[in-house]
């Protein structure tokens, strides 16, 4: 590689890193994910998303105006062929607090789920319970997961298509028992950016198919649909994500979100009256997450 090519590659990496850091910081601020004195359990699976999340949170810890702790937890589920040495070696080099939790959920899942069927749902429930228990044992105030913007959009359509709900994956979530706060710092980050960043950084990726489970076909088809839209209609994915942040309950059909029953004349409805008009659809999709100028600096974030 020539000197100019090296310089260009470094410039692109710096630009990508700044974008991911900026988007992570913005999500943390928008959803008040991290507060003074938090002890955050970073769930590291060995995939590209969780490695990138740890990188982003470590940077945020260095530059944030508040103090908080990070510690890493990995769940070794005893899948055949799981490279047990990879994560300890990586984390030792980072000099970060971590714990490897060993739980043989693989045997439990394979005993219950017929061969050839997807095990992801049961595996996820078992994993969640173990992580909640570990968070409590280790005094975590927040649990950080590596889901990104594309995961959230895919989940929105999966729930609409197969669950009959207008529901996605929230950037911040309270567990059902009210004991654990889950945060997703990469909520504003694109999967393509994360993939590129993880590749350039050379993270020791552990494949997610060690269990031999079939990929969730519904999610696979939804991902393919969104990829096709993105290729054919640039900006559509960004517009969908923007829509998730601009909900108008009075223009949907959920009586629990908006009191249609007691709606009276003389009231001003948020979102405007379009009952007799054609909806005002912009010709160009809203793209709130366009790449900013390459020279832009990382946003300074007040997390207090």
UniProtKB/Swiss-Prot annotation:
Its cofactor is Mg(2+); [4Fe-4S] cluster. Signal peptide: none annotated. It is found in: Cytoplasm. Pathway: tRNA modification. It catalyses: cytidine(32) in tRNA + S-sulfanyl-L-cysteinyl-[cysteine desulfurase] + AH2 + ATP = 2-thiocytidine(32) in tRNA + L-cysteinyl-[cysteine desulfurase] + A + AMP + diphosphate + H(+). PANTHER family: AMINOTRAN_5 DOMAIN-CONTAINING PROTEIN (PTHR43686:SF1), SULFURTRANSFERASE-RELATED (PTHR43686). Catalyzes the ATP-dependent 2-thiolation of cytidine in position 32 of tRNA, to form 2-thiocytidine (s(2)C32). The sulfur atoms are provided by the cysteine/cysteine desulfurase (IscS) system. Belongs to the TtcA family. Homodimer. The thiolation reaction likely consists of two steps: a first activation step by ATP to form an adenylated intermediate of the target base of tRNA, and a second nucleophilic substitution step of the sulfur (S) atom supplied by the hydrosulfide attached to the Fe-S cluster. This is tRNA-cytidine(32) 2-sulfurtransferase. It comes from Pseudoalteromonas translucida (strain TAC 125). The lineage of its organism: Bacteria, Pseudomonadati, Pseudomonadota, Gammaproteobacteria, Alteromonadales.
